[in-house]
Amino acid sequence: MPSEVVNGNFRLDRLPHIWCPGCGHGILMHTVAKAIDELEIDKDKVCIVSGIGCSSRASGYFNYNTVHTTHGRALSFATGIKIANPELKVIVITGDGDATAIGGNHLIHSCRRNIDITTIVFNNNIYGMTGGQYSPTTNTDDKATTAPYRNIDKPFDVCSLSAAAGATFVARGSVYHVKQMINYTKRAITHKGFSVVEGISSCPTYYGRKNKKGSAVDLMKDIKNSCILSDDINKGKDDNKISIGVFKDVSLPEYTKEYQRLVVKANSK
């Protein structure tokens, strides 16, 4: 990570981070910082909110306003922060378990409301911090601590779920596609409405080891070979490929603006 990005955006006394060697979350954290840096946003106008899990430890490293909340509830806290302080750029960092399991209900209703919050989902297909249990995004037939023979569940597609629930900007990048991930994050932050950017990440400690994926480098190569650049969310699914691109970008009434109009109307009665 370039020194100018580190020095300007992170709490140096909190580094080094806690993530395992080869974990992709540090790369995704860098893409968020780089996006904010390139947009030249006033750091005092940024608020990073996270829940619980490996990904959610990221909030403590950023040198902005940060809130480390409870499991699955980051979007609830973020909604309150945004409504009370509509001028803030509120960015939620969450994981696949935090966002789609215990926090799944909050995710779909945040999408439905179209509140101006950017949500970055660090998706490593497993619960890393609690011991390698399978998550709602773990692929069918993959193994995990709680699926020692194989996972029989079908996984959520975070982007399809978010788009269907009403998010007005939906994109997916990966730890290999760093430039694209930075670009998608910048577009999400500047978008007026609820934005979801899924970042495909790597967990060599649990997901890689349980599924015999090899080293951290092998996992990175696997992500590279599994992804295709396309704005068609369904392209490559029949061949077990993952689309990397912007799948939805529409303009619809934003929640805090509608709320403010409602307050004005109520006060005029």
Language-model region placement:
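Flexible, low-complexity linker and terminal segments
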Residues: M1-V5, S201-K269
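Short, hinge-like loop/turn segments at secondary-structure boundaries
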Residues: N65-T66, S110, S135-N139, K213-A216
